[in-house]
Each structure stands twice: as C-alpha cells, then as structure tokens.
C-alpha cells in the first residue's frame, strides 16, 4: 500500500512537471507555489503532530518528499537532455538551476564578471540559466531589441511601471507621458534645478578645505537631490546642509537586494508577498507611496515628472508609486554611480584630467555652472562621460528579452521560441572586437583616436530600441554640469598610498544597477580660479 501511494506521488510529480510546469511562466506566481509546496505541507505536518497522528504524519512526509524529489529529477532530466536550449554551450550546473549563481550574483554581486568569463570560454552564445542565453555579439543588438521583454520585468507584479512591465500597450502609453517630462522645453526648466544642486555641491566641496571627501555617498546625495526636484518638485536639502533623508536611507538599503534581482527575479516577488520577509523589501516602497500621496495632495505649478503622470486619465495610485520608484532609482542611483566612476577615472589619470580642465577653462566664459548649450559642444567632456559609461555601464548585465513564436535568428544563430535572451552590456563594452584596448580609460577613442572604436554600435549604455532609456537627456545634462563644475574649480587627487588602478581600488558591484563601493578623494582648490 505504501509503495503504491509513493508510486502515485512520483507519477503525479512527473505529470505535473511535463504537463503543467514546463508550459507557461511561473515566476510571478512564486508566492502561491511557495505556500503550496512549502508552507502548507509544513503547517499540515505540525498540525498532525499536534494531535498525535504520528503514523499519518510519517506517511505524509514520505509522500511529500517523494513528490519533491521526483519533480526535481524530472526537471534535471528535461533540462539536460530534452530542453530546447540543450545544444547551447555553458556550464552543466547552469543548465540545471539558477542556484548555481546564488553566491556569485546575490552575495558577491559579481554576475557581470562571471558572464564575461563564460563568454571567453564558450563563445558568443552561452546558456547561463536553464531557459536563458547570453549573447555577446554586437551584430545581434538591433534584432534582439525588437523582441518582447522577459519575466524579469514582472518583478513588480501585479503592479507595473514604465520599465517593469511586459504590457507593450501600457508601456507605449506611459512612454508618451514620460517623454513630455524630458522634452526640450521641460529640460530647460529642469536645468535650473540641476544648476542649483551644482552650486550647493561647489559650496560644500569648498567648505571641506582640501580634506578627503567620501565620493560615492556625496554623488548619491547630489543625484537624489536633483531627483527630488525632477520627480516631486521639491528639495530634500541633502547637499549643502548635509541633512539625512528617510528615502535616501531606504534606497541605499534596498539596493543590496539588487543581487537577488539578477540571480532570480521571483525571489523579490516572494519577499514582497511573505509577511515575515517583506519588511526590507517594502519599506522603500512605503516611502515612495508617502511621497506620491503628498504630491497628489499638493498640486504645484512646477513642471515635474508627476505633473505629467497625474494628467494620465488611466492613472493608478499603485502604478504611480512604482513609476516614482523607477524615476528615483534610475535617475539618481545610476547617475551617481557613473559620476563616481568618472571622478575616480579622472583622479587616476591626471593627464586626462588636465586636458578636460583646459577645455572647461577655455569654454567657461560666463561663469559656473555652464549652460547645457555650452556643455553639449565640449567634445572632451562628453568623451570622458562616454568612456566612463563604456567601462562602467549603469546596467552591466543588460536587458532580458523573450523570443516570440517561431523563434528568432541572431547573427545566423537560431534561438527557439519562448526562450530568454540577454545581452551583457559590460561584456560587449569590453570586447576587443568592438574596442581596442577595451579595459583602458581612453576618452580620445570618441574624438581624435576614433580608430580605437571598431564598432560604435556596440556602445549601448542607455539600451536601444523601443525600450531605450527616456531619461538619457536629463542624465547627460546632470553629468556634464557636475563634472564641468568640479573640473573648473578643483584638482582631483587620490589619497596617499592609493593604487593607480580603478578596478583594483574601486571594484564595481552588479546590483542590477552598478554600485561602486565607498572611496575618498581630495578636492584640491585650483590656484587662481574664481568661481562665479
């Protein structure tokens, strides 16, 4: 009798896998599956033990473990020998489960380096997860950009934002609204707020009197302040006054969960839906929600992002919360990391710093901060920014896409239908087939030494296609203004004893959005320079 029951359990496991679980997507249903396979069985076992039904309890445990082990065995056999991606190269453990990458992605946050290493071993097309192929081939960029988004973008399920949605119609409708916030006229209004942030930054750096300054947090404060104006139309007073802010604290805390997003996006869906695990995952969203409610209750004449989002007749409060999260995270965190990288690269390359300072001095006729109309015509400044974006793109692991019915051909390689494909930006940007001396900081590759850029189309820091970054104009304006302001007034110096190597002294962590650990620089006032 016992063997018969266990046999039925095994059969049920195999049938549920082959008929149900290999069809469709289950990531967004992670909480339901967790309760069905973990919470409920454990609760039942505890209940049976409480009433003294030990025999039934033992039998249930056997059946439960038999089902779990059988479905795991079925999954292993399918993924190794029957899966549509079985012929693609890659590590055997990666074909079986994403558990292979838990430490690399979620703990060490070095997923970008692991992917780069796999491509160096296995080639342009590598199976990095049971259902996902990583493609390091610039010829495939445009074709891949046409594909739909993958389940990675269900992480906010059941809610949506401009970025975290797979609903193309929702995205297109939301995109039109966001575009208004980054139109040329809107950018002129935003420029004044960024200028004010730069002035506060210059005042703060001057007050330090040449003492070491922790750069990573300072740049995060600057960009968070500018996002306060852009998104909510108000100041957070975090630069000159050095005030702390709950939203800023929550953002820094929640960023540590970015590794989970890269390892297995469904883990964040699970965290947000399990009462005993949700506190850290939701505290950041609670702050965003409070800001949204406050902004809705206090209409202003400011043409911030929310002035456009609130005009949307189909607006949903929860979706507004996730749009605000997107704006603050994408607008402040990613830009702050790029600014941090630029400053360190300039500090470790004094010759490049001197060239940039000369360009700034030559163009700085009307005082600081210079207007955008001047900054966009400064080739070396823009080259330094582009080179930092190449070496340290904001999203190093790239974007996930899903092949449609019939599959897709990428540079001659067929990818079966309904498979996931990602294009690792960090790896592409550091591929010697695309850029000569790819690991070196050479701003001239974008100007006088263009021969060092073999494939300009391989430069994709803001992504491409319909899902490209809408905030690029604002990010570029802010980076140009901050860097030019600093270069006009200060020399950047490393602390004594600091190695002259960016990668060795300030390694980049892949938290979905790049993170550069804390380090300090000396902002030494330039002799004879008067800041207007």
Curated annotation (Swiss-Prot):
<dbReference type="GO" id="GO:0004497">
    <property type="term" value="F:monooxygenase activity"/>
</dbReference>
<dbReference type="GO" id="GO:0020037">
    <property type="term" value="F:heme binding"/>
</dbReference>
<keyword id="KW-0408">Iron</keyword>
<keyword id="KW-0560">Oxidoreductase</keyword>
<keyword id="KW-0472">Membrane</keyword>
<feature type="binding site" description="axial binding residue">
    <location>
        <position position="469"/>
    </location>
    <ligand>
        <name>heme</name>
    </ligand>
</feature>
<dbReference type="InterPro" id="IPR002403">
    <property type="entry name" value="Cyt_P450_E_grp-IV"/>
</dbReference>
<dbReference type="InterPro" id="IPR001128">
    <property type="entry name" value="Cyt_P450"/>
</dbReference>
<comment type="pathway">
    <text>Secondary metabolite biosynthesis.</text>
</comment>
<dbReference type="GO" id="GO:0016705">
    <property type="term" value="F:oxidoreductase activity, acting on paired donors, with incorporation or reduction of molecular oxygen"/>
</dbReference>
<keyword id="KW-1133">Transmembrane helix</keyword>
<keyword id="KW-0812">Transmembrane</keyword>
<dbReference type="InterPro" id="IPR050121">
    <property type="entry name" value="Cytochrome_P450_monoxygenase"/>
</dbReference>
<feature type="transmembrane region" description="Helical">
    <location>
        <begin position="2"/>
        <end position="21"/>
    </location>
</feature>
<comment type="similarity">
    <text>Belongs to the cytochrome P450 family.</text>
</comment>
<feature type="transmembrane region" description="Helical">
    <location>
        <begin position="60"/>
        <end position="82"/>
    </location>
</feature>
<dbReference type="GO" id="GO:0005506">
    <property type="term" value="F:iron ion binding"/>
</dbReference>
<comment type="function">
    <text>Cytochrome P450 monooxygenase; part of the gene cluster that mediates the biosynthesis of the indole diterpenes nodulisporic acids (NA). Nodulisporic acid A (NAA) and its chemically modified derivatives are of particular significance because of their highly potent insecticidal activity against blood-feeding arthropods and lack of observable adverse effects on mammals, in particular the tremogenicity associated with the paspaline-derived IDTs is not observed.</text>
</comment>
<protein>
    <recommendedName>
        <fullName>Cytochrome P450 monooxygenase nodW</fullName>
        <ecNumber>1.-.-.-</ecNumber>
    </recommendedName>
</protein>
<dbReference type="GO" id="GO:0016020">
    <property type="term" value="C:membrane"/>
</dbReference>
<dbReference type="InterPro" id="IPR036396">
    <property type="entry name" value="Cyt_P450_sf"/>
</dbReference>
<feature type="transmembrane region" description="Helical">
    <location>
        <begin position="31"/>
        <end position="53"/>
    </location>
</feature>
<dbReference type="Pfam" id="PF00067">
    <property type="entry name" value="p450"/>
</dbReference>
<keyword id="KW-0479">Metal-binding</keyword>
<keyword id="KW-0349">Heme</keyword>
<keyword id="KW-0503">Monooxygenase</keyword>
């Amino acid at each position: 009798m016992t063997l018969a029951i266990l046999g039925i359990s095994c059969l049920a496991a195999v049938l549920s896998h082959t008929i149900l679980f290999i069809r469709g997507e289950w990531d967004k249903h992670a909480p339901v599956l967790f309760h069905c396979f973990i919470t409920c069985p454990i609760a039942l076992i505890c209940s049976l033990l409480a009433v003294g039904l030990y025999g039934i309890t033992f039998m249930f445990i056997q059946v439960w473990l038999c089902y779990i082990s059988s479905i795991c065995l079925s999954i292993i056999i399918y993924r190794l020998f029957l899966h549509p991606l079985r012929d693609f190269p890659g590590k055997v453990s990666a074909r079986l489960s994403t558990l292979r990458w838990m430490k690399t992605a979620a703990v060490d946050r070095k997923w970008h380096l692991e992917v780069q290493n796999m491509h160096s071993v296995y080639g342009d097309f590598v199976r990095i997860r049971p259902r996902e192929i990583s493609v390091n081939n610039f010829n495939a960029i445009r074709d891949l950009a046409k594909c739909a988004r993958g389940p990675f973008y269900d992480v906010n399920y059941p809610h949506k934002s401009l970025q975290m949605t797979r609903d193309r119609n929702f995205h297109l409708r939301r995109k039109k609204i966001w575009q208004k916030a980054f139109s040329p006229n809107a950018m002129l209004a935003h420029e004044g707020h960024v200028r004010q942030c730069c002035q506060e930054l210059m005042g703060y750096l001057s007050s330090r009197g040449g003492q070491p300054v922790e750069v990573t947090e300072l740049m995060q404060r600057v960009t968070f302040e500018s996002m306060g104006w852009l998104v909510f139309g108000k100041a957070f007073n975090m630069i000159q006054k050095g005030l702390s802010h709950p939203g800023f604290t929550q953002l820094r805390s929640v960023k540590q969960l970015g590794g989970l997003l890269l390892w297995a996006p469904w883990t964040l869906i699970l965290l947000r839906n399990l009462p005993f695990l949700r506190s850290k995952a939701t505290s950041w969203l609670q702050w965003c929600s409070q800001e949204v409610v406050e902004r809705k209750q206090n209409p202003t004449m400011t043409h911030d992002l929310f002035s456009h989002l609130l005009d949307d007749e189909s607006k949903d409060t929860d979706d507004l919360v996730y749009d605000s999260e997107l704006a603050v995270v994408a607008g402040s965190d990613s830009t702050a990391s790029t600014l941090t990288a630029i400053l360190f690269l300039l500090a470790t390359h004094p010759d490049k710093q001197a060239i940039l300072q000369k360009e700034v001095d030559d163009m700085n006729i009307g005082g600081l901060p210079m207007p955008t109309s001047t900054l966009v015509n400064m080739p070396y400044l823009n080259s330094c920014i582009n080179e930092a974006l190449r070496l340290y793109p904001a999203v190093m692991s790239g974007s996930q896409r899903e092949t449609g019915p019939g599959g897709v051909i990428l540079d001659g390689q067929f990818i079966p239908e309904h498979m996931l494909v990602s294009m690792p930006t960090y790896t592409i940007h550091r591929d010697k087939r695309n850029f000569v001396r790819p690991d070196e900081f050479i701003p001239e590759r974008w100007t006088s030494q263009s021969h060092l850029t073999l494939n300009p189309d391989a430069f994709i820091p803001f992504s491409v296609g319909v899902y490209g970054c809408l905030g690029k104009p604002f990010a570029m304006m802010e980076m140009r203004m901050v860097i030019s302001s600093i270069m006009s007034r200060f020399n950047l110096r490393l602390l004594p004893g600091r190695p002259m190597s960016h990668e060795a002294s300030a390694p980049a962590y892949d938290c979905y959005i790049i993170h550069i650990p804390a380090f300090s620089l000396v902002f030494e006032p330039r002799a004879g320079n008067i800041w207007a």
